[in-house]
């Protein structure tokens, strides 16, 4: 039986290996890519700095080594004593890699686990303890060291994972055959980095299973489609609401299903909701700049909404980079001395000040960014599949390696999960826009500088934003650190409200009140320090959505009106929601 397995396994392994080399063109496209060379250069320089400081601080190194050796001996002694399974070190809370009871109860695997965890902790603590390394270099070394350490976790290998070994023996290796088949398919559908499947990509259809709230596309240009949602109440608030999603993701994270759709909930509260659905760019859109998302994006959407509804002002909300675009739009209006067209602005997990980028900062380096720019310019865009893997590796154990083990080594089929489907439905970013984000915003933090960013021929200034603003961030957000978003809020003028939700970048925002799952913190006084603000904040139960809705109602006339007509003479209905742009999947077919 095993002879037959090994024969099949070797055939599939050869097929997968051939596909890998063919699709990735490893020799020339990956190994010799500008980005790979830049990463090697940066890692070499960082390692040299690390060794230099380690050589200059032998006492600190020896102290940690002595502690490691003492604890390692204790692990030896504990596992050598029959029945004594006392744990010297445990996995951190939330780390599910070693949840199988064999890691705790079987001496050999307990030893492997504890030795690995102890080495990992000692190595990272050693880097952290070294003086003389600048903060950015230290953060980068720790980040990439952590990537290597977690990639080499004993949980990722059959021989050192008791659960995998037992499963493979019980199934006569069929799990590995099934896993290789999935690996081959993922290699075929990946870009230059292996994108591990998180969910069944055939389980959902955009417009049928997700993004199902009824509406109509009333405008389309090269950049976006504008969706006008159909009302769910007899009367509606007089001021329409425009939502600006990030152009690095698809909008329907805010309209997954009826039970968790923010769009549907807002309609139920009487808001007239309009949504921008960004195009998934290909090489033909390489020229699209960040400023175009303002002048050809939000500005065009606002004009369309004004004509359709007959209202002179709207409320607007932006999510993540969509919020950055929205803030830039409001500042653009101010710089052009135009009439106030946006009555209030809401920012979900939005960075305006990029001085605290979080773990994304590991990639924010002139050498690395220059290499990415070279690749973007040659290709015309940043491939969304690679971008998706980059974000997954910010939480590598829970968003990458666990799926690697589950899919390829256990041979399990990915589950059907709407949120993970959206997360896997990646979108490209045009070369010009991605280059701008990395260099002008993340690296040089120009958005908060005087005459730092010019859009549509004018310098924009966030301090000129005088409309009421509502900032909501989440405490566990690892993509847009809430301390960083808080700093951005301080750069704007006007009345400001800052709210801190529980959970992370997605779950903390998509937090339907009916679930009563996550609460939030509120403090009406914006202190200079984010931590000081939090120390004086009051925790509230329930979703921040209800608080935001109460805030939005302030910027609506007291009396509601009849629902607005769908489209207008100049903005006729083109298509039913969700439109066509959101259905573009990667790789984008060039027309």
Named regions from a protein language model:
Residues 1-223, 236-237, 274, 340, ...:
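Amphipathic, low-complexity, repeat-rich surface-exposed segments
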Residues 131-167, 307, 311, 329-435, ...:
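Alpha/beta-hydrolase-fold enzymes
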Residues 236-247:
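Short beta-strand element of the alpha/beta-hydrolase
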Residues 255-273:
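Short amphipathic alpha-helix adjacent to the substrate-entry channel of hydrolases
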Residues 285-309:
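Alpha/beta-hydrolase active-site loop
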Residues 302-322:
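Alpha/beta-hydrolase fold nucleophile elbow
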Residues 465, 471-473, 477:
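Short beta-strand/loop motif that positions the catalytic acidic residue
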Residues 481-491, 502:
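Short alpha-helix in the alpha/beta-hydrolase fold that links the catalytic acid
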